[in-house]
């Protein structure tokens, strides 16, 4: 049957965690107050504000309180969809103004070209919004990589720690589980993908990170698909 598609995690797998934690997250925290003030009547932003109030169980929260909630969620690394949507919108401005480029590991830049040449389908699955993923790969320090991808998945597909999310991906891309390889640095994500029947591979870029009973690689250079 063979592998026909590769689904990659982003942070820690294709992208340095430090770029997310030290560049993108602080940028979004700093920009949130002005962004919400200036865009609160935009339909998408307004929906995110309402969703934030619903999740926080604070229906009467004013804009300042909503900002506090969202900034707290950033510090807690909450995977809440309204936060991820707003971060994507804020980062879009940062990329457009040239304030940063998306960090992508060089070995993935070469691998994604190799996989594409092999006619393998390539997808990303991240807790960051689909828009944020597209921004990362289109403004990467390796150039625009988006044409190499067949699609992207985020929290709307499901929680990355839940088997159902991976079942949903399989249903969307219409491949059998054994035709799909999921690559991530996070053990719990790999377990969930494995429970859905996917093939799995753990990316171990840091010798101190937790590892599980999975095939392991330290670089995409080691991932050769026959």
Swiss-Prot record:
- What is the protein name for this chain? Enolase-phosphatase E1
Question: So what family is this one in?
Answer: Belongs to the HAD-like hydrolase superfamily. MasA/MtnC family.
Q: Does the keyword Transport apply?
A: no
Which biological pathway? Amino-acid biosynthesis; L-methionine biosynthesis via salvage pathway; L-methionine from S-methyl-5-thio-alpha-D-ribose 1-phosphate: step 3/6; Amino-acid biosynthesis; L-methionine biosynthesis via salvage pathway; L-methionine from S-methyl-5-thio-alpha-D-ribose 1-phosphate: step 4/6
Q: Please list the cofactors this protein needs.
A: Mg(2+)
- Record-level GO BP terms: L-methionine salvage from methylthioadenosine
Role description: Bifunctional enzyme that catalyzes the enolization of 2,3-diketo-5-methylthiopentyl-1-phosphate (DK-MTP-1-P) into the intermediate 2-hydroxy-3-keto-5-methylthiopentenyl-1-phosphate (HK-MTPenyl-1-P), which is then dephosphorylated to form the acireductone 1,2-dihydroxy-3-keto-5-methylthiopentene (DHK-MTPene).
Q: Name one Pfam family in it.
A: Hydrolase
Catalytic activity from the UniProt record:
5-methylsulfanyl-2,3-dioxopentyl phosphate + H2O = 1,2-dihydroxy-5-(methylsulfanyl)pent-1-en-3-one + phosphate
NCBIfam families xref list? enolase-ppase, HAD-SF-IA-v1
Q: Which organism is it from?
A: Shewanella baltica (strain OS223)
Instruction: State the InterPro entries in the record.
Output: Enolase-ppase_E1, HAD-like_sf, HAD-SF_hydro_IA, HAD_sf
Does the record's keyword annotation contain Metal-binding? yes
Q: How is the cofactor bound?
A: Binds 1 Mg(2+) ion per subunit.
Q: What class of enzyme is it?
A: hydrolase
> Oligomeric state and partners?
Monomer.
Q: Which UniProt keywords apply?
A: Amino-acid biosynthesis, Hydrolase, Magnesium, Metal-binding, Methionine biosynthesis
Q: What is its EC number?
A: 3.1.3.77
Which molecular function terms from Gene Ontology are attached?
2,3-diketo-5-methylthiopentyl-1-phosphate enolase activity; 2-hydroxy-3-keto-5-methylthiopentenyl-1-phosphate phosphatase activity; acireductone synthase activity; magnesium ion binding
The lineage's top-level taxon is Bacteria
Coiled-coil residues: none
